[in-house]
């Protein structure tokens, strides 16, 4: 099945990438869900720069200020039962007020808990993951591809996750 990588991207960004010389290194992998939604375990991943205040450090904003073309490639683990008061956002490129008022703006944990209670989805994994979406200009994705992406993938497998909802900031 061919996947249109630009379907959900704003037309301006889509036009920029279509006109750029950058091309995908390989086709977008498409993996059909292997079980019905009401039996699937979900996790959530966001590029919103969320962190669990008081439990993990924020993303490295100081280095980004000193090196504006750099972005912190690490990730943070967010418990899906996080209390709103423990939600932190460290991301220079978004307005954090919405997520600070309601985590579901960037990470719809409460909605997925409701969907699990209703039986629409099987369950929500105990952890979600957050990256800081900005990775410099031009973007350096080596850290994501070689270190942090595989680490999150291992954690998702360990939590028996069948499907991930990705949210962008």
Indicate where each model-derived feature is located:
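Metallocofactor- and cofactor-centric catalytic cores in central/energy metabolism, strongly enriched
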Residues: 1-169
